[in-house]
UniProtKB/Swiss-Prot annotation:
Transmembrane segments: none annotated. SUPFAM superfamilies: VC0467-like. Belongs to the UPF0301 (AlgH) family. This is UPF0301 protein ESA_00394. Pfam families: DUF179 (PF02622). It comes from Cronobacter sakazakii (strain ATCC BAA-894).
Length: 187
């Protein structure tokens, strides 16, 4: 089982406030554990434009057709002061890792400097913090019915309205998440 470039979809019974009704995009999955970003929990009162202002980044030349009023997401409870930018290729930035043919994660400032310009990647999701699981921990949580898994979908990752991402991710595997009992699988 390789969960890289997959969604973790919180089961209705998962009540942890941070992960309740969350969708996590798995960026890295290997024999040491897993790392991902929550893609449906926007931070209140923080948009991409505000991050750029705090970092004193002024897009040059500014393309007014590109909106910078998009939300910044809480990627998870770890390193909440670090930025993680999920985007579509190119991966020519100084600190980029290709997750799949169509997704890249970058942690360097140079990708932020392209935001709002014609050079920015086509699709971008900015998150602060990340989620992580030690070796075997995520698999155990899946066996305990905390999570559903589904192959990632770029439309859900970048374009689906935030409030719909949990439901739409579950639909990828034929599940209507709103009709699932809270204790599914615990017969």
């Amino acid at each position: 089982m390789n969960l890289q470039h997959h969604f973790l979809i919180a089961m209705p019974a998962l009540q942890d406030p941070l992960f309740r009704r969350s969708v996590v995009y798995i960026c890295e999955y290997n024999n040491e554990g897993a790392m991902g970003l929550i893609i449906n929990k926007p931070l209140e009162n923080l948009q991409v434009e505000g991050v750029l202002q705090k970092l004193k980044i002024t897009p040059e030349p500014r393309d007014p057709a590109i909106r910078l009023d998009k939300p910044v997401f809480l990627g998870g409870p770890l390193a909440e002061d670090r930025g993680f930018i999920l985007h579509t290729p190119p991966d020519a930035f100084s600190s980029s890792i290709r997750i799949s043919d169509n997704t890249v994660i970058t942690t360097s400032r140079d990708v932020l400097e392209t935001l709002g310009t014609a050079e920015q990647p086509d699709d971008v999701l900015v998150a602060l913090g990340y989620s992580s699981w030690e070796k075997g921990q995520l698999e155990e949580e899946i066996l305990e019915n905390a999570w559903l898994t589904a192959p990632a979908d770029l439309n859900i990752l970048f374009r689906t309205p935030i409030a719909d991402r949990w439901r739409e991710a579950a639909k990828l595997i034929g599940i209507d998440i709103h009709t699932m009992p809270g204790e599914a699988g615990h017969a």
